[in-house]
Amino acid sequence: MKFLSATAVFAAALPSITSASSVESQIETKDLNSSRTGSSSSQSFTEIIPENGAEYRVSGDVSFSDFSNIPEEAETLAISHKEQPNNEVVLSEENHQASFQDSAQNQTENASEGNSPNSENTNQSSTTETESITTDEQVQNDNESAASVPTTVETATAMRLPSYHLQTESLVEGATEEDQNQPNSQNTSSGGGAFYNSQQGPLSFINDPDKDSSLTLSKIRVIGEGGAIYSKGPLSITGLKKLALKENLSQKAGGAICAESTISISSVDSIIFSKNTVTPPAANKPELPNDPSGSNGNDGSDDSNSSGNTDSNESNPNNSASNNTGSENELSSSTPSAQLPNPATPFLSSVSTNSQPIDTEPENAWHAESGSGGAIYSKGKLSIASSKEVVFDHNSATKNGGAIFGEEEIALEKIASLKFDSNTTGEKGGAIHAKTVTLSDIKNTLIFVNNTAKTPEENSLKSSQLNNQNPSEEEHQDTSEGEESQSLETSPITNQDSASSHVAIFRSIAASSSQSNSENIPNADGSTSAGGDAGSSSQPSTPGSDSSINHVIGGGAIYGEAVKIENLSGYGTFSNNNAVDHQISGSTSDVLGGAIYAKTSLTIDSGNSSGTITFSENTTSSKSTTGQVAGGAIFSPSVTITTPVTFSKNSAINATTSSKKDTFGGAIGAISTVSLSKGARFSENIADLGSAIGLVPTTQDAETVQLTTGSYYFEKNKALKRATVYAPIVSIKAHTATFDQNISAEEGSAIYFTKEATIESLGSVLFTGNLVTPIQSTTVLTSGNTSKYGAAIFGQIANASGSQTDNLPLKLIASGGNISFRNNEYRPDATNTGQSTFCSIAGDIKLTMQAAEGKVISFFDAIRTSTKKTGTLASAYDTLDINKSNDSGSINSAFTGTIMFSSELHENKSYIPQNVVLHSGSLILKANTELHVLSFDQKEGSSLIMEPGSVLSNQDIADGSLVVNSLTIDLSSVGRNSASGDNIFMPPELRIVDTSTNSGNSSSTPPSSNTPPNSTPTAQAPISKNFAATTTTPTTPPTTGNIVFLNGVIKLIDPNGTFFQNPALGSDQKISLLVLPSDQTKLQAQKVVLTGDISPKKGYTGTLTLDPQQLQNGVIQALWTFKSYRQWAYIPRDNHFYANSILGSQMSMATVKQGLINDKLNLARFDEVAYNNLWISGLGTMLSQRGGQRSEEMTYYSRGASVALDAKPTQDLIIGAAFSKMIGRSKSLKLERNYTHKGSEYSYQASVYGGSPFYLTINKEAGRSLPLLLQGVISYGYIKHDTVTHYPTIRELNKGEWEDLGWLTALRVSSILKTPKQGDSKRITVYGEVEYSSIRQKQFTETEYDPRYFSNCTYRNLAVPVGLALEGEFKGNDILMYNRFSVAYMPSIYRNSPVCKYQVLSSGEGGEIVCGVPTRNSSRAEYSTQLYLGPLWTLYGSYTLEADAHTLANMINCGARMTF
């Protein structure tokens, strides 16, 4: 049958194609409802996943535990199960299952073993299967075990199972003891001890919808990848209540789980990965065989898991590993049925005694990175989402990713609580290692604590090697000198190679491959070191290695190319995470990122959430490295944080004693950008450079540390060399920025920059208590007699050549808040505060200052900057612009604030080698303060304010002039001084320094007892070639022509009023006001005018006049003519306010009266049935009076309450009483007269009222009479006044308290013109009223400023209002509303004008005050209403408007009546 027809071929192939298609299209669903514990046979423990994948429906609490296919552990496990056979769990199936297994095992013992990954036809007989295995032998690559697949027997067994239900059973009865103890060779060289999926099909676990289920996989230890689960296809776990993987181990990768595809874990309430481990077996050099054939029981063959040899031998022999179960002696004493591996080759995992032909691995086969992923290893994306709790604790890996290793992306999102605790790794990523790491939508807590990336302790490694034993699991780390190389795929090791040849070849390949995988990390000196996955320098050099390439140890918690933490709404903590190089000597590793290492960028963004993150006590450290140590908490080229964050007690420390680089970034280390917003706090962080933030770029370009919005606090950080914040460019634009008590060994304890710095205050910026003093550094400090300045800010170009001619810009902008420098100190001896000097800013700096209106930039410490400019003219140097507008078209309207230099706390002699231009605002030199500049130019509209003893001077390095157009001299400081002779205060000085003796120094130097007048302080010598440049000291020829130009106004001010209280002013004298150059060629004074406080209003009064003759003597003097002494400044006062308060008292009594007549005595009351009534009322008054010839403008407001009780003894009589309280406030504005009145009052009033109708007989004979209604009110009031008068121009006030007594009587007679009729309730009345009021103001005396006495006075008024009223009712829905409206003309037939006498006590001056009262003619309008809600309750209210030519009054009454 050499040839067949096409039809026959198709017919023969059709069943196979159909079967394959059916299998591929269907994923098996299996119920997982029972647990398994312990077995030396993978066939009875491991779930083998079919080719098309499987879906496990977990029902109840299911666990897999206590399994190992590691040879030594497998033998021990078999012995333990022989002793306790009832603990073994086997498959639940029909009885023919056990016999089938026995048959399969017998066949495999009689045939050569091998894996057949492509065997699919499960209908073949066992004999055919055996033949197929024999004829398909292929040579496998040593790294194939990661993808090894089950044997055909296993596949056939699994496919023939009638059911996949798992349940616990005892051992099959009748099984021999030998059968129970005999280890099964299937799956002994692979991973996935519990679930093994060698195909592309998906593997998934779902929850049984009928119950909450959990899955626990524990104490499963395998040779291959994935201690508990291995899947070549996608792996997903969904909907479980709990998922726990604990104490699993892999000797390759993925201590608990390993997947060649994606991993998705979602909607699982609780996820726990604990104490899972990846530990490649250590190669034991003393026991390596010398026989190259590799015989000695193995017949020179390699097993199907030879890739385990490659990975394990890539690990350094010094690496620690977990202790295997049982010792070598125990293994040798196991049952004869189990062939032991050669003790000389412990890195081989095969337990077979027969030669095992292996398949050739495809060239593109995937290899897991050995020693990585302590809990999870994922080739594709790993996603954990929608869980309540996720915990990874005490997982470990010898290489990368102590808990999780991902070759691509890791995403942890929508988790309530996420915790990584005490995970360790030997190189990178103590908890997580991936290309991209994203943590998002963490709701409650995000915790990374005690995670570590470290090399093992060198002494423990040596000890373990000498004693031929392994270190403990806590220390097993991979310090091999390379990663897995692609060369392994093309250079397979034949089975004839000995163990020693394996080790040698693997080391060589790893060393050469490390060059291509290296990472470029900048050194602290600006150079670049190539660091990657190469080993530490303690390892011997190998072929192909490059000693200049540094190995990276980093990411104590997280290592990734890009790391993102997003939308954190809870609280995040990174604490006690460490990246540590323990190598005692000879290390060249770079140690980076104690908590987080991001190779390209780190982003922390809370978005709209309210989350915060704390980084505390994270560390990068090394004992001996000559590489770079940086980023105690975070290291990344680019760091962006837009969430509130705290960094506390993080450190970057290098303990080596020689050839070391400066550590940088105690909290954050970067090489490109650091951007923080929404606030941050840095406290007690430590590094050589940038104890809080260190940005050291590879090139000096645009690398920036940027702090925007929010509040920033830098407190008690310690720079072992320089700076809390170290960067080329520093930009701060924050609401609050505080640098407090930071310490450094050299200049710039708060900020050190090498290119540019901008500090803008939106609320407050404070530099206080920062200290430069010798402290213990990790590198050698610069020696020499060097002046230390710039305790807060230091700027110097990172170029030691001295060829740079530009200075570094430093901009200080107080746009929304103040900027202050105080108590920033250099202390040569840390314990001796007596030798301290205080200087805030120094270095080769070009300053610019801007302060908005009302804002201040204050320097309580000196400024000592230097310059790289040279020349004999001031024009050759930089300009310091003060308050220059950013808009060239505007006139400096944006910045009109104050720049202040003060010696209030200590001596302040500032030296700024720049040409100062004061564009706008004020420059203040406080008492005894000196400012030395190259030149000074004051623009129009600006103000120069000098206090006694202050000095404005040029410098001797170049000729420069002082142009002063408007000088203000503050006279506040009082006292005689020996330097000023008989003058009562030390005058300020405009000084010109002679430049003819200039030595040519371009840096600023203060003359002192220790420094010659023409000497220049030497800048701090460089730490290394890129950190500090020695200040250039050019030589310049002598120059002349320095002049003071004094023009315009000299204004004297005494804001506190202290100067003119000096008894020395009690006589005529001359007072020196300003010291000028005595050489008339250096002074030009034109149109000088003396203004300001030259005629004081209190104290020793007199007049100051300018003495023009003294200008020739280099001093401006004033002639003082004494007049008299006044305790108080005289302010003319109208005095009307106190008398005018009578009107407010009268108005509050009138308001009560209006409520009683209009509401309580309303006409409708007399038509009601006789009942008693309780009235509760609210009252309000507003009086406004315009100013006139005899009165001033005044307003009065009052509010109060009234309670009344009345009765009707008869139908026609109402009698009642009321009690009222009013609280009022009056105000009078007289700003043009420099004072304001504000008064308050409260009054108590008692009233009685009554009313009764009667008839007036008109014609007695005809019986005609006129019906009239009589209403009356009598009130007595007590009013208490309390008033304060402010005098803003003299900052004084006085107080007055007095009482008023008042009476008010009103009698109203009303006549009805139209009476109500049936169906018509309208009523028209006319009325006349007599109203008399009397208010008596008692005498009183003011207190405080210049008090006055006021006599008593009385205001009386008799008015006769005449009006017309219209009344009627509206009725509907059983509710009755009675309304009344009236208008009246109210002439005053008698009114007096109150006259009050006053006297000023200090001077005896006095007079009379005539109170302004309303005009005699006024009008009144009234409206009242009563709403009857039933027989018992009535709501009522009334409103009265009263007006005349100057006064408008509004009175309101409203409340409720209860009838009883």
UniProtKB/Swiss-Prot annotation:
Q: Which UniProt keywords apply?
A: Cell outer membrane, Cell wall, Membrane, Secreted, Signal, Transmembrane, Transmembrane beta strand
Annotated Gene Ontology cellular component terms: cell outer membrane; extracellular region
Positions of the UniProt region annotated as Disordered: 21-48, 92-212, 279-372, 455-549, 993-1021
As for subcellular location, the record says: Secreted, Cell wall; Cell outer membrane
User: Does this UniProt record's set of keywords contain Nuclease?
Assistant: no
**Extent of the signal sequence:** 1-20
Membrane disposition = Peripheral membrane protein
The cross-references to Gene3D superfamilies, in alphabetical order and at most eight, read: Autotransporter beta-domain (2.40.128.130)
Q: Where is the composition biased (Low complexity)?
A: 34-44, 115-137, 290-327, 461-471, 504-548, 995-1018
Can you tell me which family this protein belongs to? Belongs to the PMP outer membrane protein family.
Q: What is this protein called?
A: Probable outer membrane protein PmpC
Which organism is this entry from? Chlamydia muridarum (strain MoPn / Nigg)
- The gene coding this protein: pmpC
